[in-house]
Amino acid sequence: MGWPLATPSGPVLALAGAKGGPALTIDNGVMRMTSAVSRFIRGAAIALWLCCGSSMAAEGLLWFDGARPGPQASQAVELLAAAATHGLEPEDYNASALGQAITDAAQGSALEAAVIARLEQALTTAMERYLKDVHQGRIDPRLIHHNFNPRHPEAFDAAAYLQAALVARRLPEAAAEAAPRLPLYEHLREALASYRERVDHPAWRQPLPPLPDGQPGKAGKLEQGQAYAGLSMLAERLVALGDLAPAVPLPSSYEGPLVGAVQAFQQRHGLTPDGVIGKTTLAQLQVTPAARVRQIELTLERLRWTPLMLGPRMIVINIPEFVLRAYEVRDGRIHVQQEMRVVVGKALDTRTPLFDEDMRFIEFSPYWNVPPSIARAEIVPRLRRDPGYFAREGLEFVAPDGRVDRTLTAARLDAVLAGQWRIRQRPGPKNALGDIKFMFPNRDNIYLHHTPATQLFESDRRDFSHGCIRVEQPVSLAKFVLNSMPEWTEDRIRQAMSRGESATLLLSEPVPVLIAYGTTLVKEGQTYFFEDIYGLDRLLDAALRKRAPHPPSIN
């Protein structure tokens, strides 16, 4: 989902991948667009296929050299057998049966033409499906995410891609280039392999025991210096996860390196690293490696959907992480220019939607036009109970023709409920949008904005809004967005924010904004996991399990 950009040493966000367009290769942090490879694979190689008279073309065979499978057939079945390293299911492509059939064909008696034709068709169908799945994912995101339709530069023709790769005799390379060409994707594949190795680890043979002072229906708490019956199990689990060194002696109580290991674990799971094991930390410690494997697989699937950073700048908000990152490409390298905490929509009823749009303007000292749903459910009832709230919060009524009325009456409240008037909040220190909002027009009317409620950024879980996204560092974000407009210095930005008069500024260059959802990421060699706050991983998991595999038949 943009997600997914990184610097050599900076964080890699689990949220984007190349889709359809020129491959993006990053070696040691250097970004290169392999458009020449893309053009060759999709154009020139097809011309070669059609006119160069190779034995492959002449006989109409892709995988066989006469009666025996060629080397690329072996490469293909190896790729299919290794599909699990991408979080895919090898048997979706009939990998075992095809692998055995190719082995038998290579070692046994010569096959009849009809058998060869069936194997050719089955292997071609399997490889086309594999390339399509590894390139753009198995599920259309629009089937499970309202209005999410990420932009893709061009369609992916798996059949043409495969044929061109075979003619060029570079099938393994072409298959690798079909996957998202970003560091995070490869880092997550490594994490996937690591967590698969832990699936049968004895550290999870039974759950950790209840915490000290726990009561029926109430969780306890483990703090430094306390005794705990599960101390050895806890240490074993932290060693298995890499948060505790294996040679550390087990203390008699919860203290020392064990507390430090729990803090490292908490840091990797989006929790306050205070070393105190409460209900939430215990719940994360109980999650099995098998569940983490599935979480990584789902994140890899999301990476295959998400749009590539095609321009010089991009903003990505990762909802489960509650973090915004602003990226810039300079000298062929991707740099994280800004990273800040955000507040997103409440999981229960006002979730922030996923989408991909362009930021086009900024509003300084904005009015807050109260959405009708909030006016009906919250503001009008509050004003009936507490009329003084109207003046204290700087509210006013606005008619359809733009007339403004700052007098609170029962008739005006009735008119708001009837949809005849609306409520807005004037610019000022109490304005719910703060001093600035960042606009990227979209059907859900979602935007980024400042907030006077800065204390919310201190929470681990930050889903408090009505859907829009509150940013922790609005001035820094404005400086990034206005980078192409040097006349907008930090001083000028601050003046516009504090003037108290609403003003709109059009951007000279739109900035892509991606609101993404990734519950796993890798940064600085560590794998991080975040709570599935909106249940979207569960939704994706169910959709993938319902998806009929339809493996290609070889009979």
Give a label for each model feature:
Residues S9, S35-S38, S54:
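Serine residues within intrinsically disordered or low-complexity segments
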Residues G20-R32:
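Short, Lys/Arg-enriched N-terminal segments with co-localized hydrophobic residues
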Residues R32-A44:
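Bacterial N-terminal signal peptides that target proteins for export
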Residues G43-G53:
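Bacterial N-terminal signal peptides
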Residues A58, T125-E128, F148, L166-N555:
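Well-ordered beta-sheet/strand-loop patches within structured domains
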Residues A58-Q163:
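Cationic-aromatic interfacial patches
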